Curated annotation (Swiss-Prot):
HAMAP family: DEAD_helicase_RhlB. This is ATP-dependent RNA helicase RhlB. Keywords: ATP-binding, Cytoplasm, Helicase, Hydrolase, Nucleotide-binding, RNA-binding. PANTHER family: ATP-DEPENDENT RNA HELICASE RHLB, ATP-DEPENDENT RNA HELICASE RHLE-RELATED. One of its GO terms (cellular component) is cytosol. The gene is rhlB.
Length: 398
């Protein structure tokens, strides 16, 4: 039993089913994060909602708990075919879909609800077999792959009771909206389904889509600043470009860090850093658009399980990664878009734990700092790294 605590909402307060509470308890979530407390207050009553929240705020569990409650309370239709999901979650990237499906599997553990996911770059026939084997309650998919199945007549969306659009701003940026429209047209009219839309930003374009697809939605905004700055201790080291690798190597080895993410701006840079780390005896792996999907998923699993210490990634590849216990984020190069800085450092300090970010500012990228500080609304102290962190990397005897 979770004790009441002032200023905090317990999951217990929402009258969720025993099966769902059991799973939430297994995951070790005693209290709701702010977005969970606010969103669930509306969505559990069946209301539509638009949430502005970045990753790391707990929004995935918010919409999943809402979906599971809804599906548990309404019996499935009598006439039901394979390939007719009752809840549909659309997300822009493969990583995000895999992550949401994993969270959904954990939360539905005791409910008997089936979760399926479709992503491009994975074996089509294997996904099809899974679909034909049992009823699908919750379907998580990227827009393109969902349309493939839909156009082949394998998936029908006429039974969708709840629809979630995650990272709507990102879907806009990636040009997925025409596909999303095609998908939504095949679901029941908005008056007959519950629709939840999440976005890191509320631009006019996002709000227009929300207006078209939702009915009298509750609008929930969780300020992004505290995601970045309150739980993450931020440092900047002024360091010459040629010394950045030495600094990275020494930070990881001298501190014996166990789970670190390193961000760089370009794929070739990511590859180079990873190759050097591996050569110097560190368990490292890379994630970028060049890495085939099956390998990306294996890499993420190894990182989650601690077999990989350092994961080097580009912004696009790193954006959908939600792995608890990342102690440090290193910006090997400062990002060109200040928003990416917030997303990067948000990989650590997740769900209320503290984390550390260290940015390397060199002659090529330190000019990005003022824009990042403007977005954060404060200065980040720039320090010179201590000498022991710039020691030459010992050459391994091959």
């Amino acid at each position: 039993m979770v004790e009441p605590q002032e200023g905090k909402t317990r999951f217990h307060d929402f009258k969720l089913s025993n099966e769902l509470m059991h799973a939430i308890h297994d995951l070790g979530f005693p209290y709701c994060t702010p977005i969970q407390a606010q969103v669930l207050g509306y969505t559990l009553r069946g209301q539509d909602a638009i949430g502005r929240a970045q990753t790391g705020t707990g929004k995935t569990a918010a919409f999943l708990i809402s979906i599971i409650s809804q599906l548990q309370q309404t019996p499935p239709p009598k006439e039901r075919y394979m390939g007719e999901p009752r809840a549909l979650i659309i997300a822009p990237t493969r990583e995000l879909v895999v992550q949401i499906a994993k969270d959904a599997a954990a939360l539905t553990k005791y409910t008997g609800l089936n979760v399926m996911s479709f992503v491009g770059g994975m074996d089509f026939d294997k996904q099809l077999k899974a679909l034909e084997a049992r009823h699908c309650d919750i379907l998580v998919a990227t827009p393109g792959r969902l349309l493939d199945f839909n156009q082949r007549g394998e998936v029908h969306l006429d039974m969708v009771e709840v629809m979630v659009l995650d990272e709507a701003d990102r879907m806009l940026d990636m040009g997925f909206i025409p596909q999303v429209r095609q998908i939504i047209r095949q679901t029941p009219p908005k008056s007959e389904r519950q629709t939840l839309l999440f976005s890191a930003t509320f631009t006019d374009d996002v709000m227009n889509l929300a207006k078209q697809w939702t009915t009298n939605p509750a609008i929930v905004e969780i300020e992004p600043e505290n995601v970045a700055s309150e739980t993450v201790e931020q440092h900047v080291y002024a360091v010459a470009g040629s010394d950045k690798y030495k600094l990275l190597y020494n930070l990881v080895t001298q501190n014996k860090w166990e789970r670190v993410m390193v961000f760089a701006n370009r794929k070739d840079e990511v590859r180079r850093i990873e190759e050097k780390l591996v050569r110097d005896g560190i368990n490292a792996a890379q994630l970028s658009g060049d890495v085939p999907q099956h390998k990306r998923i294996r890499t993420l699993e190894s990182f989650r399980e601690g077999r990989i210490t350092v994961l080097v990634a580009t912004d696009v590849a790193g954006r959908g990664i939600h792995i608890d216990g990342i102690s440090h984020v290193i910006n090997f190069t400062l990002p060109e878009d200040p928003d990416d800085y917030v997303h990067r450092i948000g990989r650590t300090g997740r769900a209320g734990t503290s984390g550390v970010s260290i940015s390397f500012a060199g002659e090529d990228d330190s000019y990005q700092l003022p824009a990042i500080e403007a977005l954060l609304g404060r200065k980040i102290k720039c320090e010179m790294p201590p000498d022991e962190l710039l020691k030459p990397v010992p050459r391994k005897h091959h």
